[in-house]
């Protein structure tokens, strides 16, 4: 028979890896075609002129140009001008 009571296992001690989401290029910054501008979950930002929307809602540049963030009717759009 054990002389000391066995200790219980902890329910803590886990952490998920970060997903590295967010804005990668700011307004007024020059981008090349194919560069990622925003990584997001859902469409917090919507695609505008010369920008594309990936399967995971990533917004990327379709042409070389300057990033422009614009708000219209309560939605945030990303244009490449």
Swiss-Prot record:
Belongs to the bacterial ribosomal protein bL27 family. The keyword Ribonucleoprotein applies. Keywords: Ribonucleoprotein, Ribosomal protein. InterPro entries: Ribosomal_bL27 (IPR001684), Ribosomal_bL27_CS (IPR018261). Pfam families: Ribosomal_L27 (PF01016). This is Large ribosomal subunit protein bL27. Residues 1-26 are annotated as: Disordered.
């Amino acid at each position: 028979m054990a002389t000391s009571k066995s200790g219980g296992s902890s329910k803590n001690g886990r952490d998920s890896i970060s997903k590295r989401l967010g804005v990668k290029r700011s307004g007024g910054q020059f981008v090349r075609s194919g560069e990622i501008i925003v990584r997001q979950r859902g469409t917090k930002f919507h695609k505008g002129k010369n920008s594309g929307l990936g399967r995971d809602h990533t917004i990327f540049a379709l042409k070389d140009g300057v990033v422009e963030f614009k708000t219209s009717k309560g939605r945030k759009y990303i244009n490449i001008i």
